[in-house]
Amino acid sequence: MTIRGLVGEAPTKNQEMLNWIEEAVELFQPESVVFCDGSEEEWNELAEQLVEHGTLIKLDEEAQPNSFLARSNPSDVARVESRTFICSKTEEDAGPTNNWMDPEQMRAEMREHFSGSMKGRRMYIVPFCMGPITDPSPKLGIEITDSPYVVMSMRIMTRMGKEALDKIGENGEFVKGLHSVGAPLEPGQEDSTWPCNDTKYITHFPEDREIWSYGSGYGGNAILAKKCYALRIASAMARDEGWMAEHMLILKLISPEDKAYYICAAFPSACGKTNLAMIQPTIPGWRAEVVGDDIAWLHFGEDGRLYAVNPENGFFGVAPGTNYASNPMAMKSMEPGNTLYTNVALTDDNNVWWESKEGEPQHLIDWLGNEWTPDSGNKAAHPNSRYCVPIEQCPVAAPEFNDPKGVPVSAILFGGRRADTVPLVTQARDWNHATFIGATLASGQTAAAAEAAVGSLRHDPMAMLPFIGYNAGDYLQHWIDMGNKGGDKMPEVFLVNWFRRGEDGRFLWPGFGENSRVLKWIIDRIEGRVEADETVVGYTARYEDIYTDGLKETEEDIREALSVNPADWERDLADNEEWLKFLGPKVPSEVWDEFQGLKDRVEAAK
């Protein structure tokens, strides 16, 4: 079958795919069409083209081999939650946490925007696999895009190209993604270095397993394998198929006895998730490796335990705040190069810099392309600037990240950024209690999403608020159901808070690599080696059971970090009740029972 604009024959005989591509060509009207094969030649060709075009700046080959800096349009710098839609067949299925529009109405509206939106541009057909390509029943996808920057990002973030296309084969299932930056070119019209459109839509059709995105070239809005597929669409698939798609890191912790434990952790953005994923333990004999830094797909193994797979192939991390002290392994991952940077600053010797990175440059070109000095009064890198780098370059990448069976999960952590109330570490009483803890997880507002007031407390159930692809009440029910199915083989669940402050406003706990002391306590609990204090919020660690050798912090500070004040929790009760009511009538009775249990314990502790 010939496709208009494609040179030669299509490299697939999958009729459903070919028909879909033909419809897309008809709709978008691109100048040419190309199937991406994921090869190095293709990467080099795209990079060369984008450097020539001014979209990418090639970095110093010695310092940053095969690496590039992109500067986006200043209006296109983060996920736009207000323009993100879950277009399930009924509004009830989208629930109160998602924007909803009738799917037929949305398709009609988007077709108008898509119509001719690739004029003067090349259409790229990007086949990709979520998780290891060796998986006997892999989750596959195809993104159709007009952004070569997206193609390069997808090559890092997924197993992309010919192998994935071959996996789909003649009749394999795949998630369909359509993406256009929404900037058609008339003959002779000069192109922008970062084409995008003021009108933006990131829409999901969960029942049809489709994603349509328009107007943005940035990160999670455009790299559809990331949050769109790996969380929003996958969470709907997981509910239907009996697994879980979660916004969690996957960490491998190795004890002095050489026993490996796998820990998943869900933190809202800017709460130290990537730092924990690549933690370097400070306590003797303990080691850690990373399986994933952002997303975990959890399923039951043959032995009835919960196993985690990282569906991604790269890290897409926030650059500012990353340095050799806070996250040495992320920095070392970038040392071999092959990295795509977005909206960081450029040094005079063609290298990259961002706030809190080592060195004090006296002159830079900032993320907007302007001259910058320390007196400029603005940040040189955008607060949500990014590095995109292959996982395999991380010196502590666990080999299991390529194992389609996944890794057995010993513990799940929830954590937010709370200055008060929440102790350093507490164990949930059981799975239903854990679901309640996750459902009411809250954090101080950060600037990693494009909207919302910084500093306010934001509820973020399981750190999934922007990513649940269906009704949040049904999502909590799915957690309860998975717990019922897994029984006593479910992982233990813990609530952590690295960010507790004293009355004078200083952090009580040092965080970063020292968090390994908390991880050790968690393992000690799993192995039955330590007791805990039963508090209103769960089983809280006792000071004497935390390994404190070599810690600079005082005993007084650590005791305060571990403390549980029922009066603080009483203050949280009204907030939690309001939140659960907002989530609507589908919130499981088990979660309300846990809320009542907390209320009763707080009352009894007065």
UniProtKB/Swiss-Prot annotation:
CDD domains: PEPCK_GTP (cd00819). One of its GO terms (biological process) is gluconeogenesis. GO terms for molecular function: GTP binding; manganese ion binding; phosphoenolpyruvate carboxykinase (GTP) activity. Mn(2+) binds at K227, H247, D294. The active site is at C271. It holds the Pfam family PEPCK_N. It catalyses: oxaloacetate + GTP = phosphoenolpyruvate + GDP + CO2. Binds 1 Mn(2+) ion per subunit. It comes from the Bacteria. Belongs to the phosphoenolpyruvate carboxykinase [GTP] family. Catalyzes the conversion of oxaloacetate (OAA) to phosphoenolpyruvate (PEP), the rate-limiting step in the metabolic pathway that produces glucose from lactate and other precursors derived from the citric acid cycle. HAMAP family: PEPCK_GTP. This is Phosphoenolpyruvate carboxykinase [GTP]. It comes from Corynebacterium jeikeium (strain K411). The lineage of its organism: Bacteria, Bacillati, Actinomycetota, Actinomycetes, Mycobacteriales.
